[in-house]
Design a protein with these regions (language model features):
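N-terminal glycine-rich anion-binding loop in soluble enzyme alpha/beta folds
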Residues: 1-66, 131-171
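Periplasmic-binding protein-like
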Residues: 12, 77-82, 129-131, 187-194
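Short, well-structured alpha-helical segments in soluble
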Residues: 60-74, 174-187
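Hydrophobic alpha-helical segments within soluble ligand-binding/sensing domains
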Residues: 62-65, 107-124, 219-232
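Conserved beta-alpha
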Residues: 97, 101-162, 246-251
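Hydrophobic alpha-helical
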Residues: 176-209, 221-222
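C-terminal functional extensions of proteins
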Residues: 216-255
């Protein structure tokens, strides 16, 4: 008796080395798919988030591409940079990175911040609430980059932490309190920008309480990757409306 080869959809994610949040959360988000979808991770060194030269050097191209090459050996259907550095370094940084990943590996590539950009454009978001664990220098740069895209940060909350490992130590309820504070300005949406920050478990509850979309970085990356891989993100529930929002962007492929 012969059996067809098993071939679920494999999602590759490039992960900051000191991140301890995105891997377990992403795996939990993919649970409704069972063996239809699996997440696979490759790490490169990221230990601090600041505007220092040493911090910015963590995001130079070659170490990330080397990690992508190793990840590509698992034959993923998509590779995502699951990190938010383009929020302060600029979207062109991620566009160039994703193009380089695809050129090097032959695998479609995307990123957290490109996923945000797509949903913001599709939903016409112009007034944004921003929640991060970052320091003021980073937050200011993020706001300036969004202003250049026609998006105003109408309220923000931050923790003045250079991280990166420490970002994961803040409990979900602390993130929830920050989101609740920012929601008072009634933005079009609230972005929890950091993939090592625990916004995803409280997003659905906060949306119900505030009536405002709460778009967590880990969740939006997972949703975007599912769509690129040909699966329906709307099957994921309990992590906020971002999965249903991403599912509406384009028809889900049937093959």
């Amino acid at each position: 008796m012969s059996f067809p080869a098993f071939d679920g959809r494999r999602i590759g994610m490039l992960t900051p080395s000191s991140n301890t949040v995105l891997e377990p959360y992403t795996s939990a988000m993919l649970a409704p798919f069972g063996d239809e979808a699996s997440a696979h991770f490759g790490r490169f060194r990221v230990v601090e988030i600041s505007m220092s030269g040493a911090s910015q050097a963590q995001f130079t191209l070659e170490p990330i591409l080397e990690a992508a090459e190793r990840l590509a050996e698992a034959n993923p259907h998509v590779i995502a940079w699951n990190g938010t550095s383009a929020a302060w370094l600029g979207l062109d940084k991620d566009r160039a990175l994703c193009a380089a990943i695809t050129e090097r590996t032959g695998v479609p590539a995307t990123s957290t911040m490109l996923a945000y950009d797509e949903i913001f454009r599709a939903e016409g978001i112009r007034r944004l609430g921003l929640v991060t664990p970052y320091i003021d220098d980073i937050q200011t740069r993020i706001a300036a980059n969004y202003a250049a895209q026609g998006i105003e940060i109408v309220a923000e909350a931050r923790l003045e932490d250079k991280g990166n490992y420490s970002f994961a130590t803040y409990p979900p309820e602390q993130v929830a309190a920050m989101v609740t504070e920012v929601a008072q300005a009634r933005p079009d949406a609230i972005a929890v920008v950091c993939t090592n920050f625990r916004g995803a478990p409280v997003a659905a509850r906060l949306e119900a309480e505030t009536g405002i979309p709460v778009l967590d970085s880990v969740a939006i990356t997972a949703a975007h990757c599912l769509r690129v891989a040909g699966l329906d993100p709307a099957r994921v529930t309990g992590w906020g409306s971002v999965f249903q929002r991403v599912a509406r962007l384009t028809p889900v492929p049937t093959t």
